[in-house]
């Protein structure tokens, strides 16, 4: 593990700096110089028709301004006085029997980057006190995240609109501490990907490799997964977000081992996510067709990475990936025509239907990307990030090529579009399923910092697979 990451993470999560950043964004948007930011953490939720609680996931905007993972907590930030207060639950004697003593206010003050820690029973009193001192200013909150017992009546004005935008836009550019968390999530996830690659040849089922990935993440400190892992063997990899992860690696219809395993998985470290995809040849060596597609996708990714720097239009990176895909598929004979004609007609969307990447942070598809899912251009419809890249933003770079009959068949059936695809050549590639290669990178002023060290050079992957029986 990187010791420089340990040194950064030895300090407190910079909640106070984040609160200032959100308040500054509120001012920039024209909503005033003062007031109170109010946020609630996620509530403990019970499983329906059961006395057990749901797995807990802290609200991301609350964590951003508090660094606190505790359920049923609250916070206020007095913008004018630059004062951040965390409210944590009081002792519940019944709960102590089962769960032990909770964190005390003094312990929480020592642990989190806040100015004061009170109990949740003090929230309304604290809000009323602010109004009495400040003659009832404005409160900024999220409309669907205010508990029924909380009252804003003493305030002259309640704004339920700007806080969400201000927080989500503030989260786009990461500070040093956040990048250290993302780097550690990538370090651990890389270890898990390597463990999967080494076990791929001997595994019998997708779930075995998923279990190895999760266990490795857990052992190094990622107690949660960033998202439901994707372990897609053979043609299952043609489904972008395959979820089953439970099929045998030997195809029951042919009796032969499937060609590849697409692994899209990342551990979550202290609320921050890794999102990494690799493709592994299950036999230890890529088939000729698999290697051809892999090389195209790797070229798509490497040329995309070379373009990344502050100020670059993400749409340009995405468009370039389509052009690289078109050139590669033309060379293989899968596509027919000219590069310009195929690009203008959107033929590459049949094989590369998703965006080249998205923001990454506390959410896998992190905030601030401003996607346009109503875009009439199919190349951009599922691009989750639009506009220029900011220095300090973290993005995924994840081009792919897929052989999904559900997506490709309508193109083949179209008299206008089908002529651009050679079905005889295409027939050789269906069993490849899909190839996606995904790294996580920090945008810098003159380039990028790739956080992902998992092997992606095909010879390196083959060597790791083949070395383990």
UniProtKB/Swiss-Prot annotation:
Binding residues for Mn(2+) 2: 264, 275, 438
EC number: 3.4.11.9
Pfam families in the record: AMP_N, Peptidase_M24
Keywords annotated in UniProt: Aminopeptidase, Hydrolase, Manganese, Metal-binding, Metalloprotease, Protease
Coiled-coil zones: none
Cofactor note: Binds 2 manganese ions per subunit.
Cofactors required: Mn(2+)
Catalytic activity line of the entry: Release of any N-terminal amino acid, including proline, that is linked to proline, even from a dipeptide or tripeptide
Matching InterPro entries: Aminopep_P_N, Creatin/AminoP/Spt16_N, Creatinase/aminopeptidase-like, Pept_M24, X-Pro_dipept-like
Keyword Protease: yes
Binding site for Mn(2+) 1: 275, 398, 438
GO molecular function, one term: manganese ion binding
Gene Ontology biological-process annotations: proteolysis
Gene3D superfamilies: Creatinase/methionine aminopeptidase superfamily, Creatinase/prolidase N-terminal domain
Family: Belongs to the peptidase M24B family.
Functional note: Catalyzes the removal of a penultimate prolyl residue from the N-termini of peptides.
Name this polypeptide is given: Probable Xaa-Pro aminopeptidase PEPP
Protein's gene: PEPP
């Amino acid at each position: 593990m990187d010791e420089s990451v340990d040194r950064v993470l030895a300090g407190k999560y910079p909640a106070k700096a984040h609160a200032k950043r959100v308040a500054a964004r509120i001012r920039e948007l024209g909503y005033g110089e003062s007031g109170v930011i109010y946020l609630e953490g996620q509530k403990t939720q019970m499983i329906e028709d059961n006395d057990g609680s749901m797995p807990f996931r802290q609200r991301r905007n609350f964590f951003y301004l508090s660094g606190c993972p505790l359920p049923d907590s609250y916070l206020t930030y007095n913008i004018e006085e630059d004062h951040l207060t965390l409210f944590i639950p009081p002792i519940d004697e019944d709960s102590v029997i089962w769960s032990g003593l909770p964190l005390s206010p003094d312990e929480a003050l020592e642990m989190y980057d806040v100015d004061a820690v009170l109990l949740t029973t003090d929230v309304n009193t604290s809000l009323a006190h602010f109004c009495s001192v400040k003659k009832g200013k404005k409160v900024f909150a999220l409309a669907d995240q205010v508990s029924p017992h909380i009252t804003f009546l003493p305030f002259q004005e309640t704004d339920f609109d700007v806080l969400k935008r201000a927080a989500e836009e503030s989260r786009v550019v990461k500070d040093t501490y956040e990048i250290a968390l993302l780097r550690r999530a990538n370090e651990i996830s890389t270890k898990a990907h390597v463990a999967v690659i080494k076990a791929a040849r001997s595994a019998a089922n997708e779930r075995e490799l998923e279990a190895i990935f999760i266990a490795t993440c857990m052992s190094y400190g990622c107690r949660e997964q960033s998202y439901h892992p994707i372990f897609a063997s053979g043609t299952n990899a043609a489904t972008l977000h395959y979820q089953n992860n439970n099929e045998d690696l030997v195809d029951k219809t042919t009796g032969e081992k499937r060609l590849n395993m697409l692994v899209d998985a990342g551990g979550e470290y202290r609320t921050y996510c890794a999102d990494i995809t690799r493709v592994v040849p299950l036999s230890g060596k890529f088939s000729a067709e698999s290697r051809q597609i892999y090389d195209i996708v790797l070229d798509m990714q490497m040329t995309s990475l070379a373009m990344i720097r502050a100020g670059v239009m993400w749409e340009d990176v995405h468009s370039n990936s389509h052009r690289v895909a078109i050139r590669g598929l033309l060379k293989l004979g899968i596509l027919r025509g000219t590069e310009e004609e195929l690009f203008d007609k959107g033929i590459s969307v049949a094989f590369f239907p998703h965006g080249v990447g998205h923001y990454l942070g506390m959410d896998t598809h992190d905030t601030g990307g401003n996607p346009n899912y109503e875009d009439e251009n199919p190349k951009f419809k599922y691009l989750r990030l639009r506009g220029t890249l900011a220095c300090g933003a973290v993005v995924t770079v994840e081009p792919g090529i897929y052989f999904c009959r559900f997506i490709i068949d309508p193109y083949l059936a179209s008299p206008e579009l089908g002529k651009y695809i050679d079905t005889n050549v295409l027939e050789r590639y269906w069993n490849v399923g899909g190839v996606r290669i995904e790294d996580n990178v920090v945008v810098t002023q003159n380039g990028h910092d790739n956080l992902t060290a998992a092997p992606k050079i095909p010879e390196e992957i083959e060597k790791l697979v083949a070395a383990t029986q």
